[in-house]
Amino acid sequence: MRRPVIAGNWKMHMTCAQARDYMAAFLPQIERAPQDREIVLAPPFTALSTMAAAAEHSVVGLASQNVHWQDHGAFTAEISAEMLLEHGVAYTIVGHSEPRKYFSESDEQINHRARCSQAKGLIPIVCVGESDEQRERGEAERVIRRQIEQGLEGLDANKLVVAYEPIWAIGTGKTCEAAEANRICGLIRSWVGATDLIIQYGGSVKPTNIDELMAMSDIDGVLVGGASLKPDSFARIANYQAI
C-alpha cells in the first residue's frame, strides 16, 4: 500500500517569525486530516529549528531543500545529513529543477545526494522532469528516463520518493493534465520496476486541482511550491479528497 506524501517546498521564503505564524494558522486546519497520508514541509535551512519546535507533537514532518553527500568539509553553502537530522528532518529534496538550472547540478551529483540521504536514514525526494523545449521536441520520456536511471542508481526504491515535476509547469500557472501526469508517473514506476515506489506530481498544484490529481492511479502525492506558502491553501491540499 503506497502512502501518499503531500509536501510543501517553501524555497527561499519565510523568516522564523513568519514560519511560527504559518504553523499557528496551519496546524489547527489539519488536525482531522486522514491518517492515510504524510504531510511534509520543507522550509529554508534557517527556519528548520523553529519548524521542528512548532511541528512537535503534530502530524507534520520536515524536509530539507538539499543535502550534501559529505559529512563535513570545505563545502561553502552546503549542509550535511547529520546537521539536518539534529533538527528532526526526515526527507530531503534533491534534483529540483531550480538547482539543476541555476547551479548546473548533474544527475551524478543528485545521485550522490540521494545515496547519502538513504545511508543516513533520510528519505530522498528525487525530482525529475522535462523542459518546455524538450517536450516540444518529443524528448520528454527520454530525458526523464535518463534522469531516473542515473539519479536512482544504487538506491533502495522502497526508501525514496520520486517527484515528477515538468519544468514548464513550475510557477507558470500551467498545469500538466492529470491524465498525462499519471501516464508519466506510470512510466516512471515501470522503469524503476518497483510497484510500491511513491511518485509525486509537482507543477502548479493548487486547491482547485488537488482532488483530481490525487484520484489518479499512479500519483501518490504532490510536491507543492507557491500554493504551500499560504496556510489555508496548503491545508486544503493536505486535506484533499480524491474524486
Swiss-Prot record:
Primary localization: cytoplasm
Molecular function terms from GO: triose-phosphate isomerase activity
Keywords tagged on the record: Cytoplasm, Gluconeogenesis, Glycolysis, Isomerase
Top-rank EC class of the record's enzyme: isomerase
Gene3D superfamilies for this protein: Aldolase class I
Active site per database record: 96 (electrophile), 165 (proton acceptor)
Cellular compartment(s): Cytoplasm
GO BP field: gluconeogenesis; glyceraldehyde-3-phosphate biosynthetic process; glycerol catabolic process; glycolytic process
Known pathway: Carbohydrate biosynthesis; gluconeogenesis; Carbohydrate degradation; glycolysis; D-glyceraldehyde 3-phosphate from glycerone phosphate: step 1/1
Catalytic activity: D-glyceraldehyde 3-phosphate = dihydroxyacetone phosphate
Pfam families linked to this entry: TIM (PF00121)
GO cellular component: cytosol
Residues noted as binding substrate in the record, renumbered to the chain: 9-11, 171, 204, 225-226
EC number: 5.3.1.1
UniProt xrefs under InterPro entries: Aldolase_TIM, TIM_sf, TrioseP_Isoase_bac/euk, Triosephosphate_isomerase, Triosephosphate_isomerase_AS
Quaternary context: Homodimer.
Family the entry assigns: Belongs to the triosephosphate isomerase family.
HAMAP family: TIM_B
Function: Involved in the gluconeogenesis. Catalyzes stereospecifically the conversion of dihydroxyacetone phosphate (DHAP) to D-glyceraldehyde-3-phosphate (G3P).
Protein known as: Triosephosphate isomerase
Gene: tpiA
